[in-house]
Design a protein with these regions (language model features):
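Transmembrane alpha-helices and adjacent helix-loop boundaries
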Residues: 1-212
Length: 212
């Protein structure tokens, strides 16, 4: 049962990292735009989701948004805790990844942009085929660190009724009247997952250093 909870935590973290990268790319493009309105949209997104607790974001999506939907449609709406958790984690992670990806893009030599313009590539083609591959090579280690953070933050969706690793330990503790063993096991599983991912991060960082 506890390993099932670990699976859900891991899947949530993977999903949030994936969607967070997409949001991060979009947000970074907005913040690097020459247009004031687009830059403002990117800045507002980052400030809102970096400036408020993830727990508040999770509860807002699960409790407040259904109330708004119900008032508009006149029908009862029940949000899914896993979907709300995934959306909140993705939005929060994306806000942090905006700055990571933005710094990676800015780290690419400006001559690359000029070369792409010379051979006739448009902005999207330049980003897709030239700039982003180089930018992501620079930011893979911090992205892996973000993944570790997401694994630990997945425990927050326990507050809205989703059964992940920490929630599973709580249920086992309530059923057995013994919280020591399940909570200790949960801590050990979190530790094993984060240590394994940290080892992967160090390996990747070493490989990237050699390739450079």
């Amino acid at each position: 049962m506890i390993f099932t909870g670990a699976k859900y935590s891991l899947l949530l973290a993977i999903g949030a990292l994936f969607f967070g990268v997409i949001l991060g790319i979009i947000g970074a493009a907005l913040k690097l735009s020459k247009h004031f309105v687009l830059r403002a949209i990117g800045n507002i997104y980052v400030e809102i989701f970096r400036g408020t607790p993830m727990l508040l974001q999770i509860m807002f999506l699960y409790l407040a948004v259904p109330t708004v939907v119900q008032s508009i449609t006149g029908q009862r709406f029940q949000a899914d805790p896993y979907v709300c958790g995934l959306i909140a984690m993705s939005l929060n992670s994306g806000a942090y990844q905006v700055e990571l990806i933005r710094s990676g893009i800015l780290g690419v030599d400006k001559g690359q942009w000029e070369a792409c313009e010379t051979i006739g590539l448009n902005y999207v083609q330049t980003m897709r085929y030239v700039i982003l591959p180089q930018a992501f090579k620079r930011i893979i280690p911090p992205l892996i660190s973000e993944f570790i953070t997401l694994i630990k933050d997945s425990s927050l969706i326990f507050t809205i009724g989703a059964v992940e690793l920490l929630a599973t330990a709580s249920v086992i503790g309530a059923n057995t009247f013994n919280y020591l063993v399940p909570l200790t096991a949960t801590g050990a599983i979190y530790l094993v997952m984060t240590l394994c991912i940290s080892a992967i991060a160090r390996y990747v960082e070493g490989r990237l250093a050699v390739s450079d």
